């Protein structure tokens, strides 16, 4: 089961599980699909929402106020929970996940997590996250992220290496270094970009897990040298940008997280 909406130009589909975006099709481009298809040979997801943790927890356990909690799944639990559709119009959908006994067994906070999708002008999709601390006395600790995958290449006459990421302004972002298990080392190193703005895609870029950047520009475009199709993502308010596909593979997608 999924919910859909259209503005006559784009068609979007979202499923209640994880409030996960399944599809963005461009009707003006013969229903061209932009979102990764979820082919299990590479990665079975499409665009999971990450809450209340990002990545793994060391040992799958953590302690809060003297109590130990176990959560071995990657990227929290929201991606695996069924959200409620609380608002739906022709061009907007809002999904809600509230804390319950099951969530409090692994995450001891009262919360509401809202994910809103909007179809806006000029072929623009808006995604808005709202995290509400329902408790009047307890401070709430959480992490929040977005993990959308996009098809690369977008056209049958192109290949993965025809694509590149282009940032909106020249900078030298810092690449956050990870251990082999995907944990932070605490170190970072400069990532030199072509002309200060461009990263050409190659499958071997991801042989050692994701490229995680801090201090990058807050707008990045996925483009092809053919100039046929692409997309632009704005991520104001987020500290880090992750770039990933399945490591040591020829996966035909890239995630901009």
Question: How would you name each of these model-derived features?
Answer:
Residues 141, 149-235:
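Active-site/ligand-binding surface loops and adjacent short beta/alpha elements
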Residues 14, 66, 127-131, 256:
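Buried hydrophobic-core signal for structured, non-transmembrane domains
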Residues 1-64, 71-73, 215-237:
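Beta-strand-rich N-terminal accessory domains
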Residues 99-154:
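Acidic, contiguous internal or C-terminal segments within carbohydrate-active enzymes
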Residues 3, 12, 93-95, 113-115, ...:
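Hydrophobic residues positioned within well-ordered beta-strands of beta-sheet architectures
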Residues 65-67, 72-122:
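Extended, loop-rich substrate-binding clefts of extracytoplasmic carbohydrate-active enzymes
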Residues 229-257:
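Active-site pocket scaffolds in enzymes
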Residues 101-105, 171-172, 252-257:
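Surface-exposed, gly/pro-biased binding rims or lids
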């Amino acid at each position: 089961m999924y919910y859909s909406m259209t503005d006559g130009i784009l068609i979007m589909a979202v499923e209640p599980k994880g409030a996960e975006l399944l599809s963005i099709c461009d009707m003006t481009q013969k229903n061209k699909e932009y979102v990764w298809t979820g082919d299990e040979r590479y990665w079975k997801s499409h665009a999971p929402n990450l809450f209340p943790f990002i990545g793994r927890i060391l040992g799958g356990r953590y302690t809060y106020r003297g109590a130990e909690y176990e959560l071995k799944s990657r990227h929290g639990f929201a991606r695996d929970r069924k959200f409620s559709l609380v608002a739906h119009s022709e061009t907007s959908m809002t999904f809600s996940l509230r804390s319950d006994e099951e969530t409090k067994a692994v995450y001891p906070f009262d919360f509401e997590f809202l994910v809103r999708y909007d179809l806006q002008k000029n072929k623009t999709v808006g995604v808005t996250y709202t995290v509400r601390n329902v408790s009047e006395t307890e401070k709430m600790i959480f992490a929040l992220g977005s993990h959308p995958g996009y098809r690369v290449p977008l056209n049958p006459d192109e290949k993965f290496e025809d694509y590149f990421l282009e940032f909106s302004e020249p900078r030298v972002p810092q690449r956050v270094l990870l251990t082999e298990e995907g944990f932070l080392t605490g170190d970072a190193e400069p990532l030199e970009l072509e002309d200060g703005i461009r990263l050409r895609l190659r499958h071997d870029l991801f042989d050692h897990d994701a490229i995680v950047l801090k201090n990058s520009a807050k707008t990045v475009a996925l483009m092809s040298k053919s100039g046929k199709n692409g997309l632009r993502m704005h991520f104001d308010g987020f500290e880090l940008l992750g770039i990933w596909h399945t490591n040591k593979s020829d996966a035909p997608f890239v995630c901009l997280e």
